[in-house]
């Protein structure tokens, strides 16, 4: 079946934010236990920042007629150094090869891309395996307490403020 990217409509944004929180919480809860506040996983502000960024394109992902996930991509049409800001596949679809098909479809949708970039938490072993071993990314940087992301406020991060930066040169 083909992968289809359907642009998000305003009325779909609450469901998109809820999906992101629910799916991103799986590894957080497995690693650290239940958080005191759901914003400890990913805040609405962070999701909204991506959704409202004029460089970002936001989609629901379908395989045929079935919704299987969502994505927010930051597309820089000047440099073609693009970023996957948010990408999720529904957990019941994990392990089926769908993620690889989705990533290939993203690459095909933006063939001018020179470099793809994304950031994922250090404890997300499933993501690390997927991006490195299945999609051909490499880890190029590690943000942590001693090496902070230049755009992130130290007060905005908490105990799990360690992230890998991945890149894939096309």
Predicted region positions:
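Conserved catalytic-core motifs of GNAT/GCN5-like acyltransferases
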Residues: 119-120, 128, 133-156
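Conserved beta-strand in the GNAT
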Residues: 58-60, 66-75, 83, 88
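Conserved GNAT-fold acetyl-CoA-binding loop/helix
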Residues: 25-47
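A short helix-loop-beta-strand connector motif used in the catalytic cores of GNAT acetyltransferases and
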Residues: 42-60, 69, 159
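Conserved acetyl-CoA-binding loop-helix of GNAT-fold acetyltransferases
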Residues: 89, 95-108, 133
């Amino acid at each position: 079946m083909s992968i289809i990217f359907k642009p998000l409509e305003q009325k779909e944004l609450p469901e998109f934010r809820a999906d992101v929180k629910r799916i991103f919480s799986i590894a957080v809860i497995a690693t650290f236990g239940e958080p005191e506040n759901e914003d400890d996983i990913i805040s609405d502000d962070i999701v909204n920042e991506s959704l409202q960024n004029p460089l970002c394109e936001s989609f629901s992902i379908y395989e045929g007629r079935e919704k299987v996930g969502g994505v927010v991509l930051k597309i820089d049409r000047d440099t073609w150094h693009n970023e996957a800001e948010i990408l999720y596949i529904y957990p019941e679809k994990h392990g089926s090869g769908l993620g690889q098909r989705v990533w290939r479809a993203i690459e095909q949708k933006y063939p001018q891309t020179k470099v793809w970039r994304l950031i994922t938490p250090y404890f997300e072993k499933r993501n690390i395996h997927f991006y490195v071993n299945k999609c051909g990314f490499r880890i190029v940087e590690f943000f942590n307490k001693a090496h902070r992301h230049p755009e992130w406020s130290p007060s905005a991060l908490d105990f799990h403020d360690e992230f890998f930066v991945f890149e894939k040169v096309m």
